[in-house]
């Protein structure tokens, strides 16, 4: 039996789609030196090659892919978007605006200079910025622009072509820039990170190991009684002196949870909770009494929970003001926008921040109720909320405004992005609403993006040879300019206008470009995860601005003549 693979793929859109995805994901795992191609470029290359052979898929799959992707981007940005936008993120907002705005203006100028159409220009902007949201926003706006069908088809093909030709240029140039730009300025990045560490009490060790607290019990001997000198636990400040917390006391056979007024007595048996190194550093007066292995005394459920910051008495406060150790809890991690932050007593908490807290289950529950709620570790997605907000986003995208003969609509991309932001924001404020496990959200987002990339590649593949021959050199030059010049402008603005610390500035610049690989290089150069503070500050707002940039470039293009 002979199987004609070409006919089989042409006759089955679903089979073709998943063949492209499988081959592209395999290709994306390849490395060129220290640079991995990545899933997006792998799928794009395979789809372009098959597109040259005139394979194609239904455009409905393409549309659904970009809708899922942009909605999930909004959900991820939602918890921190408004806090960054309205409160302490003025510098980060301005940096993101400068980065995206300068790239948009430069792309428009180069597009007109080289005589390209809007498709090539918008695609070049998206590829040079390595930003799929730009591609998605521009494509959606083009489809609703009222172009006649042949002109629209050409613009969409050129959009994909421009993106494909400049994506690797944008990615590689930014990674190289992230490696060498810090060396061209006067201030050493590592020194800048250490300066912030000294000013704010930051832990500069990016690879800090996290240990869970352990329980050990000791019998109070004469040395410890003498050490306490009759002071109660509150006056002694046991945690400040030892790094351990007295969780239980057995006195005369009676087990109790001590309060601050308790005074240690000879023969008491105490259960100490603390990190292993804190136990090792205990004063000999604690250890000289016989260590106790009492099942009831040591029977404590130590848990580690992710606590989401929500309540007004915690939002806007510094970490030190939470006084977690006074409540017998230990802070392991601070996570903002999926980025682990340095544990800094002076970090101001935003709504939606996640604190990983360890301690006795009752105490962790108490502290969680005080500052927010414990993140639900369920594997069940709230599909009702997901679908409802998806519908709301599509309805928002249908809204149009008429000004004389000119009509303006938000489009599906902006509508779904806004609806996703609202869902993410509400999830951060209401623990039982709209829960989507991070793994599920990442999977849907990645799948939507890959479907979209497969669609644009198959659509543009037939014209890529002609495009390379006619405009390849122009695209190379334009891609380098749009990728690097906004970064330099952003650096000058942040360094000499905003006068930002260099470690925070470079992190914020990579966040404004939403480029995680470049962020890793900055952190390595600084020997610190302090740049993550800046990265998290601009990342959420940049995702939104980049989507809007794709819409804006299509809208303003006709008016430029």
UniProtKB/Swiss-Prot annotation:
Residues of the RCK C-terminal domain: 200-288, 292-373
Major localization class: membrane
GO molecular function, one term: monoatomic cation transmembrane transporter activity
Residue ranges crossing the lipid bilayer per the database entry: 8-28, 32-52, 66-86, 94-114, 158-178, 383-403, 406-426, 451-471, 475-495, 540-560
InterPro entries: AAE_transporter, RCK_C, RCK_C_sf, Transp_YbjL_put, YidE_YbjL
Topology of the protein relative to the lipid bilayer: Multi-pass membrane protein
Compartments in which it is found: Cell membrane
Record key words, sorted: Cell membrane, Membrane, Repeat, Transmembrane, Transmembrane helix, Transport
Entry's Gene Ontology cellular component terms: plasma membrane
GO BP term (any one): potassium ion transport
Matches recorded under NCBIfam families: PRK04972.1 (NF003440), YidE_YbjL_dupl (TIGR01625)
UniProt record similarity statement: Belongs to the AAE transporter (TC 2.A.81) family. YbjL subfamily.
Record-given protein name: Putative transport protein YbjL
Primary gene name: ybjL
């Amino acid at each position: 039996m002979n199987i004609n693979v070409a006919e089989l793929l042409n006759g089955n859109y679903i089979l073709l789609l998943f063949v492209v995805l499988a081959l592209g994901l395999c290709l994306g795992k390849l490395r060129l030196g220290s640079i991995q191609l990545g899933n997006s470029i792998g799928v794009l290359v395979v789809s372009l090659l098959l597109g040259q052979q005139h394979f194609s898929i239904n455009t409905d799959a393409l549309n659904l892919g970009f809708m899922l992707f942009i909605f999930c981007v909004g959900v991820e940005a939602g918890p921190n978007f408004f806090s960054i936008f309205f409160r302490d993120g003025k510098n980060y907002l301005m940096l993101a605006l400068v980065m995206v705005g300068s790239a948009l203006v430069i792309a428009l100028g180069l597009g007109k200079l080289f005589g390209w159409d809007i498709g090539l220009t918008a695609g070049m902007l998206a590829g040079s910025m390595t930003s799929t949201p730009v591609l998605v926003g521009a494509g959606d706006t083009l489809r609703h622009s009222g172009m006649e069908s042949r002109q629209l088809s050409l613009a969409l093909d050129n959009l994909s072509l421009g993106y494909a030709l400049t994506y690797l240029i944008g990615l590689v140039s930014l990674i190289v820039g992230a490696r060498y730009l810090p060396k061209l300025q006067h201030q050493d990045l590592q020194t800048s990170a250490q300066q912030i560490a000294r000013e704010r009490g930051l832990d500069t060790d990016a690879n800090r190991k996290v240990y869970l607290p352990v329980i050990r019990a000791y019998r109070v001997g004469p040395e410890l009684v003498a050490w306490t000198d009759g002071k109660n636990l509150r006056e002694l400040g046991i945690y400040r002196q030892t790094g351990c917390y007295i969780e239980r006391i057995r006195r005369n056979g009676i087990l109790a949870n001590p309060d601050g007024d308790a005074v240690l007595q000879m023969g008491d048996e105490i259960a100490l909770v603390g990190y292993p190194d804190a136990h090792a550093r205990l004063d000999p007066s604690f250890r000289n009494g016989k260590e106790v292995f009492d099942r009831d005394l040591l029977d404590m459920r130590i848990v580690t929970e992710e606590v989401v910051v929500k309540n007004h008495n915690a939002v806007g406060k510094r970490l030190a003001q939470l006084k977690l150790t006074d409540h017998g809890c230990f802070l392991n991690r601070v996570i903002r926008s999926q980025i682990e932050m340095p544990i800094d007593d002076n970090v101001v908490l935003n709504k939606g921040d996640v604190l990983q807290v360890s301690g006795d289950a009752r105490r962790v529950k108490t502290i969680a109720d005080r500052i927010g709620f414990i993140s639900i570790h369920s594997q069940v997605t709230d599909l009702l909320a997901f679908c409802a907000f998806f519908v709301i986003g599509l309805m928002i995208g249908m809204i149009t405004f008429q000004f004389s003969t000119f009509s303006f609509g938000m489009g599906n991309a902006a509508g779904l992005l806004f609806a996703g932001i609202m869902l993410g924001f509400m999830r951060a404020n209401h623990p039982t609403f709209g829960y989507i496990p991070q793994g599920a959200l990442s999977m849907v987002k990645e799948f939507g993006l890959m479907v979209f990339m497969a669609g644009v590649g198959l659509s543009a593949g037939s014209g890529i040879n002609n495009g390379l021959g006619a405009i390849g050199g122009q695209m190379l030059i334009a891609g380098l300019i749009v990728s690097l010049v906004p970064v330099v402008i952003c650096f000058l603005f942040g360094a000499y206008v905003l006068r930002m610390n260099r470690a925070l500035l470079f992190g914020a610049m990579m966040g404004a470009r939403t480029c995680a690989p470049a962020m890793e290089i900055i952190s390595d150069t600084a020997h610190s995860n302090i740049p993550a503070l800046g990265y998290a500050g601009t990342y959420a707002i940049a995702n939104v601005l980049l989507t809007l940039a794709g819409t804006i470039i299509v809208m303003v293009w006709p008016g430029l003549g």
